[in-house]
Regions:
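Flexible loop/hinge segments that line or gate small-molecule binding clefts
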Residues: 140-180, 200, 204, 303-311, ...
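Hydrophobic alpha-helical
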Residues: 119, 124-146, 224, 241-308, ...
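Short, low-complexity disordered leader/linker segments with a strong preference
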Residues: 1-67, 92, 119, 141-148, ...
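Hinge/cleft segment of the Venus flytrap/periplasmic-binding protein
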Residues: 50-60, 64-66, 202-212, 329-408
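Short, solvent-exposed amphipathic alpha-helices that sit
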Residues: 79-96, 181-185, 216-236, 251, ...
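Hydrophobic alpha-helical segments within soluble ligand-binding/sensing domains
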Residues: 55, 62, 110, 172-203, ...
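Short beta-strand elements in bilobed, periplasmic/extracellular small-molecule ligand-binding domains
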Residues: 92-104, 204-207, 229-249
């Protein structure tokens, strides 16, 4: 009887241990606002979570089993979802678990989500579009609370209360090649006005751009544009911008329509340069309504832009980056930080000016001719018509184990 009792107790302990081993750890609670655990927050907002894979090559990765998050200030959009999907797919190949959180253009929600993930035990955070007026001080505080956490940032300038540019040790910053966007688009307008350029005349441009200090990407785009102004290759007919930022596209349509009435179309304006595609959409609508023949170009791209270019009218080109590549790049940088391989990040070919400053994702031009070369072109299949620079990944940071796990 005693032997039977002992046997039954032993079996009970085995089943109890098996049950414990198969359970899941409780998820961390949000730091404030009652938004729940990071995973719950993602599910509630329609965001996606990629579970870490088991087996396979993940055991060879020094970041296998790590938990990372992509936290975007803005609401979800096609290009940001492309980024998220690529970030998560790359994380999975490296053996990590990745979550995505979109923050509805709300800075307080963005900061709360960063704090929640940091408090919740995430190993790495890829944070995007934080405001220059708060990002440096806020993220510095997060790392003081969680010194083992790794952070990489996209389109998130660091400035102190005096407006001075700052750095945070161990945090890799990267941006799009904004000045490059501007340069390549001006070059497109120069090509469209070759006779004038050959004659040594300045090309007359209606510039769609906000004033200095509006935001960091626009300021960096102005740097590239200004080079052509200073060289006398272009001259501004006028600079215009929307008067209502909350309804930027419709406001830009109205502003452009009023501006066009002051000029004699192509006799006075050789081209329109737009710093942002949401503005460009309004410009294009105004040009169509006025039956204008003035060509235009714009930074950024979305499916609506592609549809407008495919109409074969005024919209001649967009400057963009490959958002699928952007997501992979972001995950690579964060993984290398977590692996302590900052030397591999520094070996990348896309640092701006000096190692340790910030990295810039290379830009590419998508032309009207490319978009019209086949039917059904979207941002999701843009690689089918864009030139080789769109799919080039030679500029990405890598190392031996990444080459093995990611293929390059």
């Amino acid at each position: 009887m005693k032997k039977l009792t002992a046997l039954l107790l032993a079996l009970a302990m085995v089943f109890a241990l098996a049950a414990c081993g198969g359970g899941n750890a409780s998820t961390p609670a949000a730091s404030n606002g009652g938004s729940g655990a990071p995973a719950a927050s993602a599910a509630a907002s329609g965001d996606k979570s990629a579970a870490a894979p088991t087996g396979g090559d993940s055991a060879e990765s020094p970041v296998a089993g790590k938990k990372v998050a992509y936290i975007m200030l803005m609401s979800s959009a096609t290009i940001f979802q492309m980024w998220s999907d690529s970030f998560q797919a790359t994380a999975e190949k490296l053996g990590m678990k990745a979550d995505t959180f979109f923050c509805s253009d709300n800075a307080d929600q963005w900061k709360t989500q960063v704090q929640t993930c940091a408090d919740g035990g995430y190993d790495g955070l890829m944070v995007s579009h934080g405001g220059q007026e708060y990002a440096w001080d806020f993220l510095k505080g997060i790392l003081e609370q969680h010194p083992d956490l790794k952070i990489a940032t996209f389109d998130t300038p660091f400035k102190d209360a005096n407006g001075q540019v700052q750095k945070i040790d161990g945090v890799t910053q990267f941006f799009q090649q904004d000045a490059g966007f501007a340069r390549s688009l001006v070059e497109e307008l120069l090509k469209l006005n070759k006779d004038k350029v050959d004659a040594g005349e300045a090309v007359r441009i209606l510039q769609v751009q906000q004033g200095a200090g509006y935001n960091s990407p626009f300021d960096r785009r102005q740097v590239g544009y200004q080079e052509y102004l200073d060289a006398g290759k272009i001259v501004n007919v006028e600079r215009i911008a929307p008067t209502d930022d909350q309804n930027a596209t419709s406001s830009m349509r109205d502003v452009t329509a009023a501006t066009l009435q002051k000029y004699n179309d192509t006799a006075d304006i050789d081209g329109i340069w737009c710093c942002y595609d949401a503005y460009a959409q309004g410009v294009y609508q105004a040009l169509k309504e006025a039956n204008s023949e003035i060509p235009m170009v714009s930074v950024d791209i979305c499916n609506e832009d592609i549809q407008f270019m495919a109409e074969g009218k005024n919209w001649k080109a967009c400057a963009t980056t490959n958002w699928t590549s952007n997501g992979e790049f972001a995950c690579r940088v964060l993984a290398l930080e977590m692996a302590g391989q900052y030397d591999a990040i520094e070996a990348s070919s896309c640092y701006d000016k000096e190692i340790g400053a910030w990295m810039e994702i290379p830009s590419t031009i998508v032309t009207q001719e490319q978009v019209m070369s086949k039917s059904g072109v979207t941002v999701e299949n843009l690689q089918d018509v864009a030139d080789a620079s769109y799919t080039d990944t030679s500029w990405m940071p890598t190392c031996d184990w990444m080459v093995e796990l990611l293929g390059h």
